[in-house]
Every structure is written in C-alpha cells, then in structure tokens.
Amino acid sequence: MNYIWRDYNPNTMGYIEAWLDESAIQSTGLDDGFRDFYEYWANEDGFAVGENFWCKVAYENDEPFAVIAFCRHEQKTNIMEVVIVPEKRSQGKGSKLLKEFLENAEITGCAIHKSEAVIYPDNIASQKAFENAGFKYSHNHEDQDRESMLYVYDGGVNDYE
C-alpha cells in the first residue's frame, strides 16, 4: 500500500476541519464541518462505528492528507465523503486514494465488490477521481434538495443499468 490508514478520531483530528475550505464545502455535504457529519452518522439509528460505518484518515510520509467516510449497506460500500487537504488537490491523489481503498480489504475489513458514491454535478474533480478509480456514472440522483449524480463501482464493470 502507498498510504497509511488510521481510524478517524473526532477528539484528536480537529485539523480535518481546516481542510474544509469554501471549495470543499460547496462540493460536499459538510456545511457544518466534518466532526458534525461524523457525529451525526455515528449516532444515527442503524449505524454503528466499526460495524457498518467508518471514517479513515490516509497518511502520506507521516502526514495526514485525506479522510474518507463510508458505510456498508445491502452488500455495498457507500462512499459518503472524501476530503483531501487543499494543497494536495488536483494532483491525482483522489483517484489513487480511491483505488487503494477499493483494492485493499485490510483498510475496510472486507473486500469491496460493489460501491456507490453520490457526487454533485459541479464537482468535476470528484467525478474525474472516481472515474479514474473505476467508478462509472449511473444516473442522476435526487439527494435531499440538490441534484446529484450516482457513480457505481462493480469491479470496474457497470451492471447497475
């Protein structure tokens, strides 16, 4: 593996909040910050941290540079959020991170055969990162009050249509 992966700890990893610049907030659902997002899902009915909901922080050269939140539901891994530190964006890190995430069961505790992600139409960087990692655009998806796009991964083959 290229990266070191650690479990997110909301009490010691406050630096992730600083990664949420205006661009990141506009392209994610993290208007209230990553910690609030994490606390919401960690306490949501049907979700249990370490059982079907996780957040992992990726490190490169002992420096944290990305966080990924995901859950397991109906034999799929749903990627809920990916945030990369601003100075590492637009360098191919997102697709490399996603590929490593998908290909290494030790990160998630199980092999990922199917995965989904919902991406906003104006988030071109995320669309490219997910496509380069093997995801395919499936269809438009209504996500609360904002139009979104569903991307799917099935070992690199799109059979969701």
Task: Describe each PLM feature range.
Residues S95, P121-H139:
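Conserved active-site alpha-helix within GNAT-family acetyltransferase domains
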Residues M1-G14, A18, D154-E161:
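Conserved N-terminal entry element of GNAT/NAT acetyltransferase domains
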Residues E116-V118, G134-Y151:
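Conserved catalytic-core motifs of GNAT/GCN5-like acyltransferases
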Residues Y59-N61, Y153-G156:
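Active-site beta-strand termini and strand-to-loop segments that position acidic
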Residues D7-G14, W19-E81, V85-E87, L98, ...:
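Acetyl-CoA-dependent GNAT
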Residues A105-I119:
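Conserved GNAT acetyl-CoA-binding A-motif
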Residues G92:
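Glycine-rich phosphate-binding loop
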Residues R89, S115-Q127, Q144-D145:
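Conserved beta-strand-loop-alpha-helix junction that forms the acyl-donor binding cleft
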